[in-house]
C-alpha cells in the first residue's frame, strides 16, 4: 500500500510565490489537504518544487491537482540520494484541468526530489497547484 511520504519533517522549497505573498499562496498549501488553498507561482519560464525527506523513500506515484488554465503540459521528476546530483526519474504530461492527476513513477530510492513544471498553459508561465502528493514507501 502506497502512503503519502510528505511529513512535517520534509523540507520543501519552491521556485517562486505570486507577489511573494506566502501567507495566501505559499508552499505550505501544497500539502495542507485543504481544497480552498493553493501554491501559486509567480511568472517565469520554468517553475519547480523540491522536497528533502528525513529518510530514504521509494517513490511509486506522484499526484498533482492543478487549477485549470494554470497547469503544465510537461513535467519532470528528478531525485537523488545523499550527496548525489539530481538525475531524471521520469517525464510526465499533465492535462489542463482541475482534477487530481496520478502519474506512475518507476521505483526510485531517494531522499530528495525535484518536480519541474515546463511548458505552462498560462501565457505568463504561472502554475497553480492545490495538492502535491508523493506516494510510496519509507525505507526501513
From Swiss-Prot:
<protein>
    <recommendedName>
        <fullName>Nuclear receptor 2C2-associated protein</fullName>
    </recommendedName>
</protein>
<comment type="similarity">
    <text>Belongs to the NR2C2AP family.</text>
</comment>
<comment type="function">
    <text>May act as a repressor of NR2C2-mediated transactivation by suppressing the binding between NR2C2/TR4 and the TR4-response element in target genes.</text>
</comment>
<dbReference type="GO" id="GO:0005654">
    <property type="term" value="C:nucleoplasm"/>
</dbReference>
<keyword id="KW-0539">Nucleus</keyword>
<comment type="subunit">
    <text>Interacts with NR2C2/TR4.</text>
</comment>
<dbReference type="InterPro" id="IPR008979">
    <property type="entry name" value="Galactose-bd-like_sf"/>
</dbReference>
